[in-house]
Amino acid sequence: MNRIFSLIKKIVKKLFGVFGIEISRKHKPVPHRSRYNFIYWPHNRIVNWMNDKYYTNEQRKWYIQQLFVRDVGYFPNIENPQTFNEKIHWMSLNYHNPLITTCVDKYSLKKYISDNVGKEYVVPLIGVWDKVEDIDFDSLPEKFAIKVNWGDGPRFGFIVKDKSKIDVNYLKAQLSDRMQPWQNGYYHSFFWGYKNVVPKIIAEEYIEQPDGKLNDYKMYCYGGKLRHTLVCTDRDTVTKYLNMDEQWQCFAPSSKSVVDNTFPKPKMYNQMVEMAEKLAAPFPFCRVDFYETKDRIFVGEMTFHPNCGFNHYKMEWDLKMGSWIDLPEKID
């Protein structure tokens, strides 16, 4: 029977070919890709950007819940939040503090840091531009970091260690893409803090340690008090994540956590804690990130929704960390 159907299929295909009709395949071969295979079409962000003015908070909540189940694995109670992840999303929808916008904007954050703890802790700025066409790449140093100010994560920042080896056209295209209005971090999962950020491209001095390694110390502050620090190390190979409590003892809130109680405390740890708590004081929750070089520390960024509120924590830790957040009064 299969042979008969196969024969009929061949005959029909030949007849269609005679009359110039092409039978489309369900799965066509992947076409050859150009050498610049980087075009990114963020469908959901574009849809949210086009339609956000029509959305109600209930519809935004529905959208977050769909992403949450897909990425975290349980259905979140955003109306009566208990876990860390749930409370992050509650604040995204209900706590619209303008100071958060100042702090998530990687350009305006520099003034907030300078005013509150000192300009010596700000990563030095090389330049700021409103569009990629304004950047004179020839004038930039051999090493630098360049980023768009209204997003977080590696998609919005680029590290250049040797300018002679970069593809400037590729970098320009990436930066131009990240400046598009739908790339605003708000349209990913409705984190309000980003919504009113004015997009800019900034270049900063390249920060490094003498040994080439640069650890990232992410300090989690609840009500302005440090509870724990996430250390990201070995970023040039396979990144390791260590969670340290206030006594610098390891704990494992997720399956990715590495337990190593021999990992050294940064030599300027106490100063980091003091600065983190001062910068985070106005907020119910905030994470303050630091870099430590040979003899200096810098504030890298401040974030209010780690991993966009889709963290893969063990439930006991999701609940415990959630209990440390006292929800504020709503601010529309």
What residue spans do the PLM features occupy?
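Short, surface-exposed beta-strand-loop junctions and turns on beta-sheet-rich folds
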Residues: D152, R235-T237, H305-N307
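Beta-strand scaffold of nucleotide-dependent catalytic cores
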Residues: I146-K147, N215-C232, K240-N243, F298-T303
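C-terminal active-site "lid" helix and adjoining low-complexity regulatory extension at the edge
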Residues: E292-D332
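Active-site nucleotide/adenylate-binding loops and adjacent lid/helix of ATP-dependent enzymes
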Residues: N94-H96, I100-K213, G223
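A short, polar/proline- and glycine-enriched secondary-structure boundary/capping micro-motif
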Residues: G157-I159, V238-M244, G309-Y313
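A short, surface-exposed helix-loop junction/capping segment
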Residues: T83-P98, A252-D260
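Membrane-proximal basic amphipathic "stem/tether" segments
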Residues: M1-N94
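A long amphipathic alpha-helix within ATP-dependent nucleotide-binding catalytic cores
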Residues: Y194-K200, N243-I297
